[in-house]
């Protein structure tokens, strides 16, 4: 799959560039007209399940043949802020012509008009140590603190624990990195003083070590198995915090680096190592060194 959607202003083609929550291009609509839909969802964060429906956004009549793509050829007439001086005259055109046109062009996905029947929860928790990320440093920190009796919360944004260990060839303690991570997670889950959460994103860090975490509980399950709340919002007060969320590869700047077929090397490696997906057979690798 190369063409996922279209960009906001010029309707340029967009494909998958990353393999996680940092995805800027592959934005889709989840659901259909007969159910509750969720706009502006990153395709790289959606786990496949039976009955999943997703569609491209910001394109008409289809993503392959998008009328709005003409904006890309007329880009010289649409510089930044062009609307502040273009739609000034005549004044009588504003409410009936200009404003409806601008409002129709604005936005990205389509907000659902249906009532959200899903259940949502919130929870308050306290811990001695909150750790974001389950890579080698996060797991080592959680294990050491838990062994010393500390109350630990380990949060991992993705569905699988291990972080960089999932794509590397390193060994830890005479074990393969992935096996070491699996063993540590198994031990942590058995400890009564440890809370281990995957699909949980810590997105807010406030005064006095108050952190907010969003846990996706049943987003990855088919409708027939969605008995639990859809999401849970955690308010966590921590004595200490370890941020071990890893790094994000910085894309290099060159012409048309926003189009389908351009993907970060770290993402290509993760798709191959974790999901068994080959992103291409004849790649051109561009590095900065």
Where are these regions (language model features)?
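Residues forming the flavin
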Residues: 1-289
